[in-house]
Amino acid sequence: MSSQVVIVGGGVIGSSIAYFLRASDPTVAVTVIERDPTYARSSSALSAASIRQQFSTPLSIEMSLYGIEFLRTLGERLEVDGHRPSIDLHEGGYLFLATPAGDATLRENHALQTRLGADIRLMDRDALKATFPWLNVDDLASGAYGVSGEGWFDGYGLVQALRKKAQALGARYVPADVTGVVRDGRKVTHVVTRDGERYACDTLVNAAGAWSRPLSAMMGIDIPVYARRRSIFNVSSPAKLAACPLLIDPTGVYFRPEGKTYICGTSPSPDKDPDDLPLDEVDHDLFDDVIWPTLAHRVPEFEALRVEHCWSGYYEYNVFDHNAIIGYHPDLDNCVFANGYSGHGLQQGPATGRGVSELILGGRYATLDLSPLGWERVLENRPIVEKNVV
């Protein structure tokens, strides 16, 4: 008998799970319910679409090592009817910068990253200036540069490629908004949509991203994941920054090339970061008061720049420890969660899709063990703190 898997959320996480399920076992019936089929409000499409191995937790590093392997071979993996999709992967590297106060942490993280196989180069202040002459290094002690395996790509293109391949393999996508679930004891038996349709499920996957908290509440589960707005600014400047990577300032402000322009952003301070702010608004004060002054300090040529375009998207922000929550909840026998990526969902999507597929089909992780990201740590108050949240 074929198994019915219903996935709520058709962004990069949900579509990756759908793809791996159908690629691994064509007898599994997969239905993906996506409330926003145009992806106009999708975090996958609105993000800065980048990948790195410069994390402070081993599992995040390993997930992104698989992520870059997947992205490099995406055209071959996700080919449909002779068409090989391209996501314009540019391995321009991340450059994390540290002041003397942050130098020890950066070096500790670098040792972990390279031990796990990441291609990260540790640089002192002189090396930073020699490699990036446009950079102000006066207040810096060191930097860590991703020589390969880190960079940026077309996030919307990745979602579309995964979706189209999943559909070609037999996954069904339904444009609908989930408004309820039917729970029978320790199982969810049906998902109910706004139009009154009921979808039976042997397994339910919560991949609803920034909307995972209300879906979890329908299931009777309190998940510490909230929708937190992040604004991105596309700026033009006469500055010509040779070999420009995705730069992370010690303040948390970031920028990277985007064609002939740049995109930039940062996370707001906790006291200015409430839940569920509207996506049709942009935090211009954050740009004027924090981002631009920081850019101009770090790259003096950025004194002259102009905002060309700006937009906002949501982080599905795990306030517990900024890491994803992946796996079954102990109170529900047939519900898998894949939520709370806190800005890392695009790059961790392939590893999540592979792992969740293994968990559903075989009852365990067969390749990379994602169990440390399970619900147990949340329920037992054992956070896995990620220090490198951008």
Question: What do the PLM-derived regions correspond to, one by one?
Answer:
Residues 49-131, 252-254, 296:
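Dinucleotide-binding Rossmann-like beta1-alpha1 core, especially the glycine-rich loop
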